[in-house]
Regions:
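FAD-binding core/adjacent interface of flavoenzyme oxidoreductases
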Residues: 1-7, 60, 66, 70-167, ...
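Long hydrophobic segments that form regular secondary structure
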Residues: 172, 177-191, 275-278, 283-289
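Beta1-alpha1 glycine-rich phosphate/pyrophosphate-binding loop at the start
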Residues: 6-82, 86, 125-132, 142, ...
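Conserved small/polar residues in nucleotide/adenosyl-binding loops
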Residues: 340-344
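Fold-independent oxyanion-binding glycine-rich loops
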Residues: 9-10, 32-33, 71-73, 118-121, ...
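A structured beta-alpha segment of the ubiquitous adenosine-cofactor-binding alpha/beta core
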Residues: 70-109, 229-233, 240-242, 247-249, ...
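FAD-site-proximal beta/loop scaffold in flavoenzymes
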Residues: 133-166, 265-339
Length: 344
């Protein structure tokens, strides 16, 4: 068997490590966080995925011979440590892992026969709107991570998370991560929650253009929206809407979001759907906390640069279609590091 390093312990990293170990290879998994699991551990709320399930799988993999190294930021320089740390409020402190150490890519390449990059698509898609620098605006992944980390570390006693208790919450993004933000905010005791979705409201049943066995493009009400309906009496989602401006108070805190309705029209030549703002449709939504769940753009570039692998236009690691090899010999990819999740 070969000595193989897997960089990242999310779903694809764990799957790759598990399969390679079963084929007789010696596998070491490197994780920059203080716990193994990646997205499974910190990106998905506990009420949706109990962490004892992840811990149990990790213990089984350890017993089978897989080695795990946590707080190891492979490819990072001192300046690149904790790249997701937000600058506003106390979020930076909450996200910081004091045990984190930088591990040189050259060291990994020399020590192992092959390397698998399984770092995920961890760059959150930002939004461009006036007032984006207001305090109280966070990426959804940061909000969810600090909440779960505080829960696991102290049962919330350390207060090292951003609480939505008594706050008006605005979630930007209609996907799974946005739904998790809605559910988490409600369980924290938010005053209100609104979830914005740029796309039109899906039909209840399949359209003729969306036959089986295609993925059903229909309206789905997930647990977060169901809880919002139970608590506040209405679905939190507002469709075909986006934010034009964040309004601040005198201290720079976000207090309102100026929204605008959108219209979608198919281009006769290309067949693509084009979006435009509806003139005169602006209105304001009160918000003390804004959570951006607008999808992801690609992997952390410093990891790719450290290993010398090429990136595509989406900042994902470049590989041939249907293949996993990079331009660097013995460096491969697994999972979302080489493709992008567009929705969050």
């Amino acid at each position: 068997g070969k000595k193989i390093a897997v960089i990242g312990s999310g779903p694809s990293g764990l799957a790759a490590a598990d399969q390679l170990n079963k084929r007789g290879h010696s596998v070491t998994v490197y994780e920059k966080s203080d716990r193994v699991g990646g997205l499974l551990m910190y990106g998905i709320p506990n009420m949706k995925l109990e962490k004892q399930i992840i811990d149990r799988k990790i213990e089984v993999m350890k017993a089978e011979g897989v080695t795990f190294v946590t707080s190891a930021n492979v490819g990072a320089t001192k300046a690149a440590m904790n790249p997701m740390v937000a600058k506003e409020d106390a979020m930076g402190e909450y996200l910081t892992n004091p045990e984190e150490k930088a591990v040189k890519a050259d060291t990994i390449l020399k020590e192992y026969d092959s390397v698998i990059l399984a770092c995920g698509a961890s760059n959150p898609r930002d939004i461009k709107a006036k007032g984006r620098d207001a305090k109280g605006i966070y990426f959804a992944v940061d909000f969810l991570k600090t909440t779960t980390k505080s829960l696991l570390n102290s049962g919330f006693k350390d207060k090292k998370y951003v609480s939505a208790k008594g706050k008006n919450v605005l979630v930007i993004g209609g996907g799974d991560t946005g739904n998790d933000c809605v559910g988490t905010s409600i369980r924290q005791g938010c005053k209100s929650v609104v979830q914005l979705e740029m796309m039109p409201k899906p039909p209840v049943c399949r359209a003729e253009s969306n036959p089986w066995p295609e993925w059903p493009k229909i309206l789905k009400t997930d647990y977060g929206q169901e809880e919002a309906i139970a608590v506040f009496g209405e679905d939190p989602r507002i469709y075909e809407t986006t934010v034009k401006e964040f309004i601040k108070d005198k201290d720079g805190n976000v207090v309102k979001a100026k929204c605008v309705k959108l219209a979608w029209k198919k281009d006769a030549k290309t067949g693509r759907m084009n979006m435009s703002e509806i003139e005169g449709s602006e209105y304001e939504v009160p918000c003390d906390i804004v959570l951006i769940a607008a999808g992801f753009l690609g992997s952390q570039e410093y990891v790719a640069k450290a290993f010398g692998v090429e990136l595509n236009e989406r900042t994902n690691v470049k590989t041939e279609a249907g293949a996993y090899a990079t331009n660097v010999p013995k460096v491969f990819t697994a999972g979302a590091v080489s493709y992008t999740h567009l929705r969050a």
